[in-house]
Each structure stands twice: as C-alpha cells, then as structure tokens.
UniProtKB/Swiss-Prot annotation:
GO cellular component, one term: 3-isopropylmalate dehydratase complex
Function: Catalyzes the isomerization between 2-isopropylmalate and 3-isopropylmalate, via the formation of 2-isopropylmaleate.
Stated family: Belongs to the LeuD family. LeuD type 1 subfamily.
Protein name listed in UniProt: 3-isopropylmalate dehydratase small subunit
Gene that produces this protein: leuD
Superkingdom of source: Bacteria
Organism (species): Synechocystis sp. (strain ATCC 27184 / PCC 6803 / Kazusa)
EC assignment: 4.2.1.33
Record pathway: Amino-acid biosynthesis; L-leucine biosynthesis; L-leucine from 3-methyl-2-oxobutanoate: step 2/4
One of the protein's GO biological processes: L-leucine biosynthetic process
GO molecular function: 3-isopropylmalate dehydratase activity
Catalytic reaction annotation: (2R,3S)-3-isopropylmalate = (2S)-2-isopropylmalate
Record key words, sorted: Amino-acid biosynthesis, Branched-chain amino acid biosynthesis, Leucine biosynthesis, Lyase
Subunit structure: Heterodimer of LeuC and LeuD.
Length: 200
C-alpha cells in the first residue's frame, strides 16, 4: 500500500479565497478519457488572463510539490478533474486555510493530504515562499506539522484522513488488488454467489 507520511519540497503560493473547481480546470477539459495530460491545463483560463504571470507559469515554481492556498479552496462543482489536474501538474500536498468538503475528499481518495492552519500562518508561509522560492517546506503527517526554515506550526486534518494516509488505506484500488485472495475466499462462502451449483 502507498503510505503517505511526509512530503518535502519546494512550494507554490496561490493567494486568494474561494478559488473554485472551474478555475482549477475549466469545463471544456472534462471530456478527456483519462486524466493524463490534465496537468498542462490546470488554471488554464487564469493563466491565459495573466499572460504568463500566474504562479503555475512562473519558472521558480515549476518543480514545486506543495501548494499553499487560502480559504475555501476547491469550492464549486464536484469534479474529480480538479484535484487530478493539480496532481498531474506535480503537486503532492496542499496546505490552506480551508477546503471545500468534496474537493478535500477527492484529494484524499488520490493520496493528496489537504491540511489546514489559521490565516496568519498561511500568509506568513506564502510570503516566505515568495521571498525565497527555493525554500524547503516539510509536511509531516505523523506529527501533523509544517516546517520551513527555522519555523514550524501545527496543522489540522481529521483523524480518519490522517490514519488513512499513514496506513496507505486511501488507495482503495490498491487495497482491492492486495486483498484479492481474501476477497475470493469470502466470495466462496457466500451461497447466493453459487446458487446454480447449490441447486444442482
């Protein structure tokens, strides 16, 4: 199973409240058969409007693995394409003030932790990243804390989400594959799956 215990790397500050899923990935990109390639279209309209000055276009953030956002990130329609686009771009964790519930659940289902902290700590982190884009940001899920430079602050995520990530239980498909033997053994014991054999 894919355990998620710690994510460390460069970070990308995305300032603004109520950034919805239609901004994250515009509706015209939802017709894809697979999620492959969605990363290049993340924030497509915002990036076009800002003419190359959007944080997702700036060269200093191109290898960032941590996204730092503000309040109510991922609100709007419940499209799984939104977290998938962020993931395919290269983000592995999101730190913010708050998240829309469905977006948060979709991220968890893909092994991407979304943790929260008060506005002041998020703003300080965003400013620190802007001042030094090479700043290493570490999210430790075992201690539920973020560390950067000589600073550290606690973050919040539900006990259930934390345990799922630490144990690797977020990966439902992986669990099914890993437990195929147990599933088959249980199926053998269920009479309604073998009614034709029983009747004979």
């Amino acid at each position: 199973m894919s355990q998620v215990k710690q994510i460390q790397g460069k970070a990308l500050p995305l300032v603004g409240d109520d950034i919805d899923t239609d901004r994250i990935i515009p509706a015209r990109f939802l017709r894809c058969v697979t999620f492959d390639g969605l990363g290049e279209h993340v924030f497509a309209d915002d990036r076009q409007q800002q003419g190359g000055n959007h944080p997702f276009d700036l060269s200093q953030y191109q290898d960032a693995t941590v996204l730092v956002v503000n309040r109510n990130f991922g609100c709007g329609s419940s499209r799984e394409h939104a977290p998938q686009a962020i993931i395919k771009w290269g983000i592995k964790a999101i730190i913010g003030e708050s998240f829309a519930e469905i977006f948060l659940g979709n991220c968890l289902a893909n092994g991407v932790p979304c943790v929260t902290a008060p506005h002041g700590q998020i703003a300080d982190l965003q400013q620190a990243i802007t001042a030094d884009p090479n700043l290493a940001v570490n999210l430790d899920l075992t201690t539920a804390a973020v560390t950067y430079g000589d600073r550290s602050f606690p973050v919040i995520l539900s006990d259930g989400a934390q345990q799922m990530l630490l144990d690797g239980q977020w990966d439902t498909c992986g669990q099914l594959v890993q437990n195929q033997g147990k599933i088959a053994a249980t199926a053998e014991k269920l009479p309604y799956l073998h009614w034709q054999t029983s009747a004979a």
